[in-house]
């Protein structure tokens, strides 16, 4: 069964650290991590070593902050 995972972290190694929060609907936490590394790495041109994960947590549908993820789940 799918679960909703929230990842909080920061990108280091740039002029100033950038903080981010990402939410994914995945089967395993590892899938969410891989997707996050891929998205952040390609969008900001940083290596995985420069992406620091601060927190990974499973959240309920009511806690979702991402409007895109909310809309996607409502459609299903």
UniProtKB/Swiss-Prot annotation:
GO terms for biological process: translation. One of its GO terms (molecular function) is structural constituent of ribosome. GO terms for cellular component: ribonucleoprotein complex; ribosome. Keywords: Ribonucleoprotein, Ribosomal protein, RNA-binding, rRNA-binding. Transmembrane segments: none annotated. It holds the Pfam family Ribosomal_L18A. Part of the 50S ribosomal subunit. Binds 23S rRNA. Belongs to the eukaryotic ribosomal protein eL20 family. This is Large ribosomal subunit protein eL20. It comes from Methanococcus maripaludis (strain DSM 14266 / JCM 13030 / NBRC 101832 / S2 / LL).
């Amino acid at each position: 069964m799918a679960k909703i995972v929230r990842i909080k972290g920061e990108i280091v190694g740039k002029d100033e650290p950038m903080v981010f929060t990402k939410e994914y609907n995945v089967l395993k936490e590892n899938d969410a991590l891989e997707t996050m590394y891929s998205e952040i790495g390609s969008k900001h041109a940083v290596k995985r070593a420069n992406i620091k994960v601060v927190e990974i947590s499973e959240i309920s549908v009511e806690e979702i902050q991402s409007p895109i993820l909310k809309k996607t789940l409502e459609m299903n």
